Amino acid sequence: MDIRPNHTIYINNMNDKIKKEELKRSLYALFSQFGHVVDIVALKTMKMRGQAFVIFKELGSSTNALRQLQGFPFYGKPMRIQYAKTDSDIISKMRGTFADKEKKKEKKKAKTVEQTATTTNKKPGQGTPNSANTQGNSTPNPQVPDYPPNYILFLNNLPEETNEMMLSMLFNQFPGFKEVRLVPGRHDIAFVEFENDGQAGAARDALQGFKITPSHAMKITYAKK
């Protein structure tokens, strides 16, 4: 029995070793090019591992995403996509539970931020060194040499299965995208061209570190002029 088209698509055959938050970010980056994504439901229970639901605002968006990304190699496995079953109470319940958990997390984060701000205000002498230390410990950027802004981006650390279509789908959601250029004989690097420096920079910032496979976080720099 065929499932009627609806706003929610069901995805399975995904790598179940990916952390939930990383999976959600990656799915959002991939699917938001087709339209407004209302929510992404990905649970790490045994029954739901390697599966997710993506809810679009428009029906046309879910239909287009299903057609374009069917079999797309995501973290090393081809995605299987279909429309979610209509009138499914399971999806509604999962969305409700997920939303409640996220709200609690946000409240906890807000309290932590307030407490940190209060502590920093009480001890101004300690605030600056701590901030400097934190920044110093969490900046991988020096490892990736960058050049002045350019309308062409240089990608490296790409997995072996990378192809032009895969990269085009990732980058064509950004304004000004022109083309992807692969390097013959090299699967790990590629160039992406935009209309201007600013548009290239926006794509660079948004997709920096995007993982096509678990072991390959994409490194993006401006191409050397």
Curated annotation (Swiss-Prot):
Compositionally biased spans, kind Low complexity: 113-123
GO cellular component: catalytic step 2 spliceosome; cytoplasmic ribonucleoprotein granule; fibrillar center; nuclear speck; nucleoplasm; nucleus; spliceosomal complex; U1 snRNP
Stored PROSITE patterns: RRM (PS50102)
Any GO MF annotation of the entry: U1 snRNA binding
Residue ranges constituting the RRM domain according to the UniProt record: 7-86, 151-225
Record-linked InterPro entries: Nucleotide-bd_a/b_plait_sf, RBD_domain_sf, RRM_dom, U2B''_RRM1, U2B''_RRM2
Keywords: Acetylation, Isopeptide bond, mRNA processing, mRNA splicing, Nucleus, Phosphoprotein, Repeat, Ribonucleoprotein, RNA-binding, Spliceosome, Ubl conjugation
UniProt-listed CDD domains: RRM1_U2B (cd12478), RRM2_U2B (cd12481)
Positions of crosslink type Glycyl lysine isopeptide (Lys-Gly) (interchain with G-Cter in SUMO2): 111
Source species, domain of life: Eukaryota
Biased composition (Polar residues): 127-141
GO biological process: mRNA splicing, via spliceosome; U2-type prespliceosome assembly
Compartment(s) where it occurs, according to its Swiss-Prot or TrEMBL record: Nucleus
Claim: Ubl conjugation is one of the keywords in the record: yes
Residues found modified as N6-acetyllysine: 111
Pfam families named in the record: RRM_1
Cross-referenced PANTHER family: U1 SMALL NUCLEAR RIBONUCLEOPROTEIN A/U2 SMALL NUCLEAR RIBONUCLEOPROTEIN B
Entry similarity comment: Belongs to the RRM U1 A/B'' family.
Protein name: U2 small nuclear ribonucleoprotein B''
Species whose genome carries this gene: Homo sapiens
